[in-house]
């Protein structure tokens, strides 16, 4: 597809396969390969929003208005925490949001350094599923 990171290409292909045609994207370094892929994919229309909390509610509003699942892509660390209010609203309104966060390599998590908090499960219990994609390997 578009990225040198195979897991990003697989993610993009799966989003398209399962009916994602719109994505709200926020700037960041950790999610930049994902944002680039989404925004160059001819099957996905991207809507950039700078503030993650606002982006969450923009995505929720789009899901309500269009009655379709919307992807929301943010960077690592506290950016994911900022979408928690919209994630909770979407969960209780039964509106499909696919929330994607770019994260640091696993060995960098929980190192008492800024923006290295645990991402997996951060939005639970207000999401139906939380998954972590495997990191790409050079094998």
Regions found by a protein language model. Give the residues of each.
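N-terminal alpha/beta PP-like core and its mobile active-site loop of ThDP/TPP-dependent enzymes
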Residues: 1-139
